Amino acid sequence: MENLATLYPAHIIELNRRVAEITAREQLAGLVIHSGQPHRQFLDDLDYPFKVNPHFKAWLPVIDNPHCWLIVNGRDKPQLIFYRPVDFWHKVADLPEDFWTTEIEIKVLTKADKVADLLPGKLQEWAYIGEHLDVADVLGFGSRNPEAVMSYLHYHRASKTAYELACMRRASEIGVRGHVAAKSAFYAGASEFEIQQAYLAATDMGENDVPYGNIIALNQNAAILHYTALEHVSPKQRLSFLIDAGGSFHGYASDITRTYAFEKNLFGDLIAAMDKLQLAIIEMMRPGVKYVDLHLATHQKLAQLLLDFKLVQGDPQGLIEQGITSAFFPHGLGHMLGLQVHDMGGFLHDERGTHIAPPEAHPFLRCTRTLAANQVLTIEPGLYIIDSLLNELKQDGRADWINWQMVDQVRPFGGIRIEDNVIVHSDHNENMTRDLGLHG
Protein backbone atom coordinates (compact mmCIF):
# COMPACT_ATOMS: atom_id res chain seq x y z
CA MET A 1 0.00 0.00 0.00
CA GLU A 2 1.34 3.41 -0.98
CA ASN A 3 2.64 5.72 1.73
CA LEU A 4 0.49 8.83 1.71
CA ALA A 5 2.95 10.74 3.89
CA THR A 6 5.61 10.27 1.22
CA LEU A 7 3.35 11.37 -1.63
CA TYR A 8 1.63 14.31 0.05
CA PRO A 9 4.44 16.94 -0.09
CA ALA A 10 4.61 16.72 -3.89
CA HIS A 11 0.82 17.08 -3.98
CA ILE A 12 1.04 20.36 -2.07
CA ILE A 13 3.86 21.57 -4.31
CA GLU A 14 1.68 20.99 -7.37
CA LEU A 15 -1.37 22.71 -5.85
CA ASN A 16 0.81 25.65 -4.83
CA ARG A 17 2.18 25.85 -8.37
CA ARG A 18 -1.33 26.06 -9.77
CA VAL A 19 -2.35 28.75 -7.30
CA ALA A 20 0.80 30.78 -7.98
CA GLU A 21 0.16 30.71 -11.72
CA ILE A 22 -3.50 31.67 -11.67
CA THR A 23 -3.23 34.32 -8.95
CA ALA A 24 -0.35 36.00 -10.79
CA ARG A 25 -2.36 35.97 -14.00
CA GLU A 26 -5.43 37.43 -12.27
CA GLN A 27 -3.43 39.82 -10.06
CA LEU A 28 -4.71 38.34 -6.81
CA ALA A 29 -2.88 38.14 -3.50
CA GLY A 30 -4.12 34.59 -3.06
CA LEU A 31 -7.13 32.39 -2.41
CA VAL A 32 -9.08 31.90 0.81
CA ILE A 33 -10.94 28.61 0.62
CA HIS A 34 -13.90 28.11 2.95
CA SER A 35 -14.75 24.57 4.06
CA GLY A 36 -18.39 25.59 4.34
CA GLN A 37 -21.10 26.02 6.95
CA PRO A 38 -23.96 23.83 8.16
CA HIS A 39 -27.36 24.27 6.51
CA ARG A 40 -30.28 24.39 8.95
CA GLN A 41 -33.43 22.45 8.06
CA PHE A 42 -36.49 24.64 7.58
CA LEU A 43 -38.39 25.34 10.82
CA ASP A 44 -36.14 22.97 12.75
CA ASP A 45 -33.09 23.00 15.00
CA LEU A 46 -31.31 20.26 13.02
CA ASP A 47 -28.76 20.72 10.25
CA TYR A 48 -28.52 18.78 7.02
CA PRO A 49 -25.48 16.50 6.82
CA PHE A 50 -22.42 18.67 6.20
CA LYS A 51 -20.70 18.39 2.82
CA VAL A 52 -17.32 20.06 2.53
CA ASN A 53 -16.28 22.39 -0.30
CA PRO A 54 -14.39 20.20 -2.81
CA HIS A 55 -11.78 22.93 -3.32
CA PHE A 56 -11.03 22.72 0.39
CA LYS A 57 -10.60 18.96 0.60
CA ALA A 58 -8.33 19.06 -2.45
CA TRP A 59 -5.63 20.35 -0.11
CA LEU A 60 -6.16 18.22 2.97
CA PRO A 61 -8.40 15.40 4.21
CA VAL A 62 -10.55 17.49 6.55
CA ILE A 63 -14.01 16.58 5.28
CA ASP A 64 -16.30 16.82 8.29
CA ASN A 65 -15.53 20.15 9.99
CA PRO A 66 -17.42 23.32 8.97
CA HIS A 67 -16.18 26.87 9.59
CA CYS A 68 -12.61 26.03 8.57
CA TRP A 69 -10.58 28.20 6.20
CA LEU A 70 -7.50 27.64 4.07
CA ILE A 71 -5.22 30.50 3.04
CA VAL A 72 -3.02 29.83 0.00
CA ASN A 73 -0.95 32.11 -2.22
CA GLY A 74 1.32 29.65 -4.02
CA ARG A 75 4.45 30.86 -2.25
CA ASP A 76 4.07 30.47 1.49
CA LYS A 77 3.15 27.41 3.50
CA PRO A 78 -0.64 26.94 3.32
CA GLN A 79 -2.41 28.10 6.47
CA LEU A 80 -5.38 26.21 7.90
CA ILE A 81 -7.77 27.99 10.24
CA PHE A 82 -9.20 24.99 12.09
CA TYR A 83 -12.51 25.37 13.90
CA ARG A 84 -12.54 24.02 17.47
CA PRO A 85 -15.33 25.65 19.49
CA VAL A 86 -16.03 25.19 23.16
CA ASP A 87 -19.17 23.08 22.86
CA PHE A 88 -20.73 20.64 25.33
CA TRP A 89 -23.57 19.74 22.93
CA HIS A 90 -21.56 18.23 20.10
CA LYS A 91 -18.35 16.33 19.45
CA VAL A 92 -15.58 18.83 18.82
CA ALA A 93 -13.03 17.85 16.18
CA ASP A 94 -9.63 16.90 17.52
CA LEU A 95 -6.68 19.06 16.57
CA PRO A 96 -5.15 17.37 13.51
CA GLU A 97 -1.96 15.37 14.00
CA ASP A 98 -2.02 13.28 10.82
CA PHE A 99 0.70 12.95 8.16
CA TRP A 100 -0.37 16.09 6.30
CA THR A 101 0.09 18.50 9.21
CA THR A 102 3.83 18.88 8.51
CA GLU A 103 2.97 20.67 5.27
CA ILE A 104 0.25 22.95 6.68
CA GLU A 105 0.43 25.73 9.26
CA ILE A 106 -2.53 25.39 11.63
CA LYS A 107 -4.30 28.11 13.61
CA VAL A 108 -7.25 27.40 15.90
CA LEU A 109 -10.57 29.25 15.63
CA THR A 110 -12.88 28.93 18.63
CA LYS A 111 -15.70 31.24 17.46
CA ALA A 112 -16.86 31.13 13.85
CA ASP A 113 -17.77 34.81 13.79
CA LYS A 114 -14.23 35.81 14.84
CA VAL A 115 -12.52 34.42 11.74
CA ALA A 116 -11.68 37.93 10.48
CA ASP A 117 -9.05 38.14 13.21
CA LEU A 118 -7.14 35.26 11.57
CA LEU A 119 -7.65 36.08 7.89
CA PRO A 120 -5.15 38.14 5.86
CA GLY A 121 -5.35 41.90 5.73
CA LYS A 122 -6.55 43.68 2.58
CA LEU A 123 -9.09 40.99 1.72
CA GLN A 124 -10.12 43.07 -1.28
CA GLU A 125 -6.96 41.68 -2.92
CA TRP A 126 -7.91 38.05 -2.20
CA ALA A 127 -10.47 35.75 -3.82
CA TYR A 128 -13.01 33.85 -1.76
CA ILE A 129 -13.57 30.26 -2.91
CA GLY A 130 -16.70 28.74 -1.45
CA GLU A 131 -20.46 28.56 -1.26
CA HIS A 132 -21.37 31.25 1.25
CA LEU A 133 -21.14 34.46 -0.73
CA ASP A 134 -22.94 36.46 1.93
CA VAL A 135 -20.13 35.64 4.36
CA ALA A 136 -17.58 36.69 1.75
CA ASP A 137 -19.35 40.03 1.35
CA VAL A 138 -19.43 40.70 5.08
CA LEU A 139 -15.72 39.92 5.37
CA GLY A 140 -14.87 42.25 2.49
CA PHE A 141 -13.40 39.97 -0.16
CA GLY A 142 -12.63 41.67 -3.46
CA SER A 143 -13.82 38.75 -5.55
CA ARG A 144 -15.86 35.62 -5.02
CA ASN A 145 -15.31 32.46 -7.04
CA PRO A 146 -13.89 34.42 -10.00
CA GLU A 147 -14.67 32.62 -13.24
CA ALA A 148 -11.09 32.65 -14.51
CA VAL A 149 -9.80 31.08 -11.30
CA MET A 150 -12.54 28.46 -11.13
CA SER A 151 -12.08 27.45 -14.77
CA TYR A 152 -8.34 27.11 -14.27
CA LEU A 153 -8.70 25.00 -11.12
CA HIS A 154 -11.43 22.81 -12.60
CA TYR A 155 -9.49 22.19 -15.80
CA HIS A 156 -6.32 21.15 -14.00
CA ARG A 157 -8.19 19.09 -11.42
CA ALA A 158 -8.49 16.41 -14.11
CA SER A 159 -4.75 15.72 -13.81
CA LYS A 160 -4.37 13.76 -10.59
CA THR A 161 -1.22 13.82 -8.48
CA ALA A 162 0.35 10.60 -7.23
CA TYR A 163 -1.18 11.31 -3.81
CA GLU A 164 -4.64 11.67 -5.33
CA LEU A 165 -4.30 8.45 -7.30
CA ALA A 166 -3.27 6.63 -4.12
CA CYS A 167 -6.36 7.95 -2.34
CA MET A 168 -8.56 6.87 -5.23
CA ARG A 169 -7.13 3.37 -5.20
CA ARG A 170 -8.10 3.14 -1.53
CA ALA A 171 -11.57 4.49 -2.28
CA SER A 172 -11.87 1.78 -4.92
CA GLU A 173 -10.79 -0.89 -2.45
CA ILE A 174 -13.49 0.24 -0.04
CA GLY A 175 -16.12 0.22 -2.77
CA VAL A 176 -15.14 -3.24 -4.01
CA ARG A 177 -15.38 -4.59 -0.47
CA GLY A 178 -18.94 -3.34 -0.28
CA HIS A 179 -19.84 -4.76 -3.67
CA VAL A 180 -18.65 -8.22 -2.69
CA ALA A 181 -20.81 -8.12 0.45
CA ALA A 182 -23.83 -6.82 -1.48
CA LYS A 183 -23.54 -9.56 -4.10
CA SER A 184 -23.48 -12.22 -1.39
CA ALA A 185 -26.53 -10.67 0.27
CA PHE A 186 -28.42 -10.68 -3.04
CA TYR A 187 -27.84 -14.37 -3.66
CA ALA A 188 -28.74 -15.10 -0.02
CA GLY A 189 -32.22 -13.62 -0.55
CA ALA A 190 -31.84 -10.19 1.06
CA SER A 191 -34.17 -7.27 0.33
CA GLU A 192 -32.87 -4.03 -1.15
CA PHE A 193 -32.76 -2.48 2.31
CA GLU A 194 -30.88 -5.46 3.72
CA ILE A 195 -28.40 -5.38 0.85
CA GLN A 196 -27.78 -1.71 1.61
CA GLN A 197 -27.03 -2.54 5.25
CA ALA A 198 -24.62 -5.28 4.17
CA TYR A 199 -22.83 -2.81 1.93
CA LEU A 200 -22.51 -0.16 4.62
CA ALA A 201 -21.28 -2.67 7.19
CA ALA A 202 -18.63 -4.06 4.84
CA THR A 203 -17.33 -0.60 3.95
CA ASP A 204 -17.54 0.79 7.50
CA MET A 205 -19.52 3.76 6.19
CA GLY A 206 -22.78 5.36 7.19
CA GLU A 207 -25.31 6.66 4.69
CA ASN A 208 -23.84 10.15 5.04
CA ASP A 209 -20.32 8.85 4.34
CA VAL A 210 -20.90 7.29 0.92
CA PRO A 211 -19.93 9.55 -1.99
CA TYR A 212 -23.46 9.38 -3.44
CA GLY A 213 -26.74 7.70 -2.65
CA ASN A 214 -26.35 3.99 -3.32
CA ILE A 215 -28.48 2.46 -6.07
CA ILE A 216 -29.62 -0.96 -4.86
CA ALA A 217 -32.16 -2.18 -7.40
CA LEU A 218 -33.80 -5.59 -7.69
CA ASN A 219 -35.66 -6.77 -10.78
CA GLN A 220 -37.48 -4.07 -12.74
CA ASN A 221 -36.27 -1.33 -10.39
CA ALA A 222 -32.96 -1.60 -12.27
CA ALA A 223 -34.62 0.25 -15.16
CA ILE A 224 -34.77 3.40 -13.01
CA LEU A 225 -31.40 5.06 -13.57
CA HIS A 226 -31.13 6.76 -10.18
CA TYR A 227 -33.25 4.42 -8.09
CA THR A 228 -32.72 4.97 -4.33
CA ALA A 229 -36.03 3.85 -2.78
CA LEU A 230 -34.77 0.67 -1.01
CA GLU A 231 -37.73 -1.69 -0.64
CA HIS A 232 -37.77 -3.51 2.71
CA VAL A 233 -39.55 -6.62 1.44
CA SER A 234 -37.87 -9.05 -0.92
CA PRO A 235 -39.65 -9.62 -4.24
CA LYS A 236 -41.54 -12.89 -4.58
CA GLN A 237 -39.48 -13.74 -7.63
CA ARG A 238 -35.78 -12.82 -7.56
CA LEU A 239 -34.52 -12.11 -11.07
CA SER A 240 -31.77 -9.51 -11.15
CA PHE A 241 -29.71 -7.07 -9.10
CA LEU A 242 -28.10 -3.79 -10.14
CA ILE A 243 -25.84 -2.05 -7.64
CA ASP A 244 -24.26 1.35 -8.25
CA ALA A 245 -22.28 2.28 -5.14
CA GLY A 246 -18.87 3.68 -4.26
CA GLY A 247 -16.46 4.34 -1.46
CA SER A 248 -14.83 7.43 0.02
CA PHE A 249 -11.27 7.91 1.21
CA HIS A 250 -9.79 11.25 2.32
CA GLY A 251 -12.42 13.06 0.26
CA TYR A 252 -11.93 11.08 -2.95
CA ALA A 253 -14.61 8.86 -4.46
CA SER A 254 -15.01 5.60 -6.27
CA ASP A 255 -18.10 4.92 -8.39
CA ILE A 256 -18.71 1.26 -9.27
CA THR A 257 -21.65 -0.56 -10.85
CA ARG A 258 -22.38 -4.25 -11.34
CA THR A 259 -25.41 -6.22 -12.51
CA TYR A 260 -26.21 -9.85 -11.66
CA ALA A 261 -28.75 -12.43 -12.81
CA PHE A 262 -30.11 -14.69 -10.07
CA GLU A 263 -30.16 -17.68 -12.41
CA LYS A 264 -28.45 -18.63 -15.67
CA ASN A 265 -30.69 -17.33 -18.44
CA LEU A 266 -30.93 -14.94 -21.36
CA PHE A 267 -30.44 -11.95 -19.08
CA GLY A 268 -27.24 -13.48 -17.73
CA ASP A 269 -26.01 -13.83 -21.31
CA LEU A 270 -26.85 -10.17 -21.90
CA ILE A 271 -24.79 -9.19 -18.86
CA ALA A 272 -21.82 -11.20 -20.14
CA ALA A 273 -22.09 -9.53 -23.55
CA MET A 274 -22.28 -6.06 -21.98
CA ASP A 275 -19.23 -6.91 -19.88
CA LYS A 276 -17.24 -7.70 -23.03
CA LEU A 277 -18.49 -4.49 -24.64
CA GLN A 278 -17.40 -2.44 -21.64
CA LEU A 279 -13.91 -3.96 -21.55
CA ALA A 280 -13.53 -3.36 -25.29
CA ILE A 281 -14.27 0.35 -24.79
CA ILE A 282 -11.74 0.54 -21.94
CA GLU A 283 -9.13 -0.98 -24.28
CA MET A 284 -9.65 2.02 -26.56
CA MET A 285 -8.70 4.52 -23.85
CA ARG A 286 -5.35 6.25 -24.27
CA PRO A 287 -3.96 9.81 -24.20
CA GLY A 288 -5.20 11.81 -27.17
CA VAL A 289 -8.48 9.92 -27.58
CA LYS A 290 -11.63 12.04 -27.33
CA TYR A 291 -14.11 10.82 -24.73
CA VAL A 292 -16.94 11.65 -27.13
CA ASP A 293 -15.50 9.14 -29.59
CA LEU A 294 -15.58 6.45 -26.90
CA HIS A 295 -19.24 7.22 -26.27
CA LEU A 296 -20.07 7.02 -29.97
CA ALA A 297 -18.14 3.75 -30.28
CA THR A 298 -20.23 2.38 -27.42
CA HIS A 299 -23.41 3.06 -29.37
CA GLN A 300 -21.94 1.29 -32.39
CA LYS A 301 -21.10 -1.79 -30.34
CA LEU A 302 -24.45 -1.66 -28.54
CA ALA A 303 -26.32 -1.57 -31.84
CA GLN A 304 -24.69 -4.84 -32.86
CA LEU A 305 -25.33 -6.37 -29.43
CA LEU A 306 -29.03 -5.50 -29.64
CA LEU A 307 -29.17 -7.14 -33.05
CA ASP A 308 -27.31 -10.23 -31.84
CA PHE A 309 -29.86 -10.73 -29.07
CA LYS A 310 -32.76 -9.97 -31.42
CA LEU A 311 -34.04 -7.10 -29.29
CA VAL A 312 -34.13 -4.96 -32.43
CA GLN A 313 -34.08 -5.36 -36.18
CA GLY A 314 -32.48 -3.36 -38.94
CA ASP A 315 -28.92 -2.21 -39.50
CA PRO A 316 -26.49 -0.85 -36.87
CA GLN A 317 -26.13 2.62 -38.39
CA GLY A 318 -29.87 3.00 -38.78
CA LEU A 319 -30.39 2.02 -35.14
CA ILE A 320 -28.04 4.80 -34.09
CA GLU A 321 -29.36 7.45 -36.47
CA GLN A 322 -32.98 6.74 -35.51
CA GLY A 323 -32.17 7.05 -31.80
CA ILE A 324 -32.98 3.40 -31.09
CA THR A 325 -29.74 2.73 -29.23
CA SER A 326 -30.36 5.87 -27.15
CA ALA A 327 -33.72 4.48 -26.04
CA PHE A 328 -31.89 1.48 -24.57
CA PHE A 329 -28.83 3.48 -23.42
CA PRO A 330 -30.01 7.03 -22.65
CA HIS A 331 -27.17 8.25 -20.42
CA GLY A 332 -23.54 9.08 -21.10
CA LEU A 333 -20.68 6.59 -21.14
CA GLY A 334 -19.25 8.03 -17.93
CA HIS A 335 -17.54 11.02 -16.39
CA MET A 336 -14.45 12.32 -14.69
CA LEU A 337 -13.94 11.10 -11.13
CA GLY A 338 -12.07 12.47 -8.14
CA LEU A 339 -12.99 14.84 -5.33
CA GLN A 340 -16.54 14.68 -6.64
CA VAL A 341 -18.29 11.71 -8.21
CA HIS A 342 -19.04 13.84 -11.27
CA ASP A 343 -15.79 15.75 -11.04
CA MET A 344 -15.65 19.29 -12.37
CA GLY A 345 -13.99 20.12 -15.66
CA GLY A 346 -15.53 17.44 -17.85
CA PHE A 347 -16.58 19.94 -20.53
CA LEU A 348 -13.51 22.22 -20.45
CA HIS A 349 -11.28 22.38 -23.53
CA ASP A 350 -8.63 24.53 -21.87
CA GLU A 351 -7.74 26.32 -18.64
CA ARG A 352 -9.42 29.49 -19.88
CA GLY A 353 -12.80 27.77 -19.59
CA THR A 354 -13.64 27.09 -23.24
CA HIS A 355 -16.71 24.86 -23.11
CA ILE A 356 -17.22 21.84 -25.35
CA ALA A 357 -20.86 20.76 -25.32
CA PRO A 358 -21.83 17.12 -25.85
CA PRO A 359 -23.20 16.10 -29.26
CA GLU A 360 -26.78 17.20 -29.82
CA ALA A 361 -27.93 13.58 -30.07
CA HIS A 362 -26.29 12.71 -26.74
CA PRO A 363 -27.13 15.57 -24.35
CA PHE A 364 -26.56 13.57 -21.17
CA LEU A 365 -22.87 12.84 -21.82
CA ARG A 366 -20.93 14.30 -18.88
CA CYS A 367 -17.46 14.49 -20.43
CA THR A 368 -16.16 15.89 -23.72
CA ARG A 369 -12.47 16.11 -22.79
CA THR A 370 -9.56 14.62 -24.69
CA LEU A 371 -7.94 11.93 -22.56
CA ALA A 372 -4.54 12.61 -21.00
CA ALA A 373 -2.26 10.82 -18.59
CA ASN A 374 -3.27 10.87 -14.90
CA GLN A 375 -6.95 11.41 -15.61
CA VAL A 376 -9.46 9.16 -13.87
CA LEU A 377 -12.75 8.36 -15.57
CA THR A 378 -15.64 5.98 -15.29
CA ILE A 379 -16.73 3.72 -18.13
CA GLU A 380 -20.34 2.65 -17.57
CA PRO A 381 -22.33 1.50 -20.60
CA GLY A 382 -25.91 0.45 -19.96
CA LEU A 383 -28.82 -1.41 -21.50
CA TYR A 384 -32.28 -0.86 -20.01
CA ILE A 385 -35.93 -1.56 -20.73
CA ILE A 386 -37.36 1.88 -19.91
CA ASP A 387 -41.02 1.93 -20.89
CA SER A 388 -41.32 5.71 -21.14
CA LEU A 389 -38.52 5.83 -23.73
CA LEU A 390 -39.72 2.79 -25.65
CA ASN A 391 -43.26 4.19 -25.73
CA GLU A 392 -41.90 7.23 -27.57
CA LEU A 393 -40.73 4.89 -30.31
CA LYS A 394 -44.24 3.46 -30.58
CA GLN A 395 -45.82 6.88 -30.76
CA ASP A 396 -43.59 8.45 -33.41
CA GLY A 397 -43.37 5.70 -35.99
CA ARG A 398 -40.18 3.93 -34.93
CA ALA A 399 -41.85 0.86 -33.42
CA ASP A 400 -40.83 -1.42 -36.30
CA TRP A 401 -37.20 -1.24 -35.22
CA ILE A 402 -38.05 -3.09 -31.99
CA ASN A 403 -38.67 -6.80 -31.44
CA TRP A 404 -41.33 -6.27 -28.81
CA GLN A 405 -41.62 -9.96 -27.94
CA MET A 406 -37.96 -10.08 -26.91
CA VAL A 407 -38.26 -6.77 -25.08
CA ASP A 408 -41.14 -8.22 -23.06
CA GLN A 409 -38.92 -11.15 -22.05
CA VAL A 410 -36.20 -8.83 -20.73
CA ARG A 411 -38.46 -6.18 -19.15
CA PRO A 412 -38.87 -7.89 -15.72
CA PHE A 413 -35.07 -7.78 -15.25
CA GLY A 414 -34.96 -3.98 -15.53
CA GLY A 415 -31.58 -3.25 -17.00
CA ILE A 416 -27.82 -3.63 -17.00
CA ARG A 417 -25.02 -1.25 -16.12
CA ILE A 418 -21.36 -2.17 -15.64
CA GLU A 419 -19.01 0.54 -14.40
CA ASP A 420 -15.28 0.55 -13.75
CA ASN A 421 -12.95 3.32 -12.56
CA VAL A 422 -9.95 3.72 -14.85
CA ILE A 423 -6.71 5.69 -14.55
CA VAL A 424 -5.25 6.73 -17.90
CA HIS A 425 -1.46 6.40 -17.89
CA SER A 426 0.90 7.44 -20.67
CA ASP A 427 1.47 3.84 -21.78
CA HIS A 428 -1.41 1.81 -20.31
CA ASN A 429 -4.75 1.93 -18.53
CA GLU A 430 -5.13 1.01 -14.87
CA ASN A 431 -8.55 -0.45 -14.19
CA MET A 432 -8.71 -0.03 -10.43
CA THR A 433 -12.00 -1.89 -10.16
CA ARG A 434 -10.90 -5.03 -12.00
CA ASP A 435 -7.43 -4.98 -10.46
CA LEU A 436 -9.12 -5.39 -7.08
CA GLY A 437 -10.83 -8.56 -8.27
CA LEU A 438 -14.34 -7.28 -9.00
CA HIS A 439 -15.10 -8.78 -12.39
CA GLY A 440 -18.27 -8.40 -14.39
Swiss-Prot record:
Give the family per the record.
Belongs to the peptidase M24B family. Bacterial-type prolidase subfamily.
In the record, biological process GO terms are: proteolysis
InterPro entries reported in the protein's UniProt record: Creatin/AminoP/Spt16_N, Creatinase/aminopeptidase-like, PepQ_N, Pept_M24, Peptidase_M24B_aminopep-P_CS, X-Pro_dipept-like, X_Pro_dipept
Q: What's one Pfam family here?
A: Peptidase_M24
Summary of the function given for this chain in its UniProt record: Splits dipeptides with a prolyl residue in the C-terminal position.
Q: Please tell me whether the keyword Cytoplasm is annotated for this protein.
A: no
Keywords per UniProt:
Dipeptidase, Hydrolase, Manganese, Metal-binding, Metalloprotease, Protease
What NCBIfam families does this protein map onto?
Answer: PRK13607.1 (NF010133)
Q: What is its EC number?
A: 3.4.13.9
- UniProt cofactor(s): Mn(2+)
Q: Name one GO cellular component term.
A: cytosol
Substrates-to-products reaction catalysed? Xaa-L-Pro dipeptide + H2O = an L-alpha-amino acid + L-proline
Gene Ontology terms, MF aspect: aminopeptidase activity; metal ion binding; metalloexopeptidase activity; phosphoric triester hydrolase activity; proline dipeptidase activity
Q: Which residues bind Mn(2+) 2?
A: 244, 255, 419
What protein name is recorded for this chain?
Answer: Xaa-Pro dipeptidase
Q: Note the SS bond partners.
A: none
Cofactor binding mode, per the note?
Binds 2 manganese ions per subunit.
Which residues of this UniProt protein bind Mn(2+) 1?
A: 255, 335, 380, 419
